[in-house]
Amino acid sequence: MEANEERCILLKYPHPSSDISSEYLLLELDDDLLKTLEENPEEEIVFKSDFDKKASVLCTSDKTYAVRQVVQSNSYLLFDELSPTDWVLNDTCYSFLEVERIYGFIFSDDKISYWDEDSVELKPISLTKDQFIRSVPASRNEVDSFLQKNFFMVKNEFLYRLSPSYICSIIDWIFVIAQQLHIDFASFEFKILKKPAMDDEFDWDSVICVLESISSPIKDNVLPKKFNIDLELTTFWYGRFLLEGINSISSDEFIQLWDNRLPYPCKGLPSLNLLKGYYFHDTPNTIQYLSGDQLPREPSRRFQSLFQLKSKWLYEELWSFVKDLALSKSRVEALILKYGRKQTSRDGVYINSRGTW
């Protein structure tokens, strides 16, 4: 199955007298997936190719499952009838599909064009939102959440991502206008910025996109809906964009550069804790940018990539780059001990590589 293809099937309980198709697969449902189907019989099930095209994932509207074919030495007997007095053997089956809940893996590659202040005239080519959803091994709701949190917008029916420089210029503008209009960041309506945006020739769709990515709605059931700008989240994005363009830098120097770049309300907030999972210490006193998006999804290749960067990791630092490999903490810890050796010292707990890679 190609990465941009999908096959939708509707799972329904068959009537006992219905014929069993000669083409079938047995699917083992875990409790969570079974509950979903029982509560919503019309739930759409989508099979998609993983990024490496060597495996498939199963997606409901909001969850993603890894799919693995299990081959057995014994067999399942499949009967036409459920009557205990008149069973007719239809076929035997030596394998079934096993599903395991995982995090959807979403990566925005060069198929999604950047949109910036010059794009109004250029009209870059991109994908539609539905095309993008079909191309990534994740559920629709997981993709929707990712797009909203990462500065993506739909423009002229196509999906675009805002460029980092354009994002920062819009955020700088938002904070300047907010100060002029005495806007309370803890509770305000987006529409109050629309006229200033038009006056200053900012694309309103882009402004909304940025606001949605750095703020959260206030859940008070009062209309019109109001939002709260998250200053720590805003600080995070400035730090991430800044570090992404730097090869290696001392931690103290980076914090100073980061703080200098921020709008006034975010001054003093920079901390490396905000960037966990987006940097690693290449030396004890210097850091480099690293994002999970750059790392393979398959566990052995993920650990291989990490241990090729350095053979010894502080446990907490390594955890930030492998925590998405499984939903349960115990499963992640088991993977760490499978591919690494734990070492305890006065400076903390470290994980050393088990292999030469």
From Swiss-Prot:
Q: Name one GO cellular component term.
A: nucleus
What's the domain of life for this entry? Eukaryota
Q: Which Pfam families match?
A: Dcc1
Q: Please provide the record's keywords in A-Z order.
A: Cell cycle, Cytoplasm, DNA replication, DNA-binding, Nucleus
Keyword Cell cycle part of the UniProt annotation: yes
Report the protein's function: Essential for the fidelity of chromosome transmission. Required for the DNA replication block checkpoint. Replication factor C (RFC) complex has an essential but redundant activity in sister chromatid cohesion establishment. An RFC-like complex (ctf18-RFC) is formed where ctf18 replaces rfc1 in the RFC complex along with the association of dcc1 and ctf8. This complex is required for efficient establishment of chromosome cohesion during S-phase. Acts as a PCNA loader, loading PCNA onto primed templates.
The similarity annotation says: Belongs to the DCC1 family.
Q: What is the protein named?
A: Sister chromatid cohesion protein dcc1
Q: What is the lineage of its organism?
A: Eukaryota, Fungi, Dikarya, Ascomycota, Taphrinomycotina
Encoding gene (name): dcc1
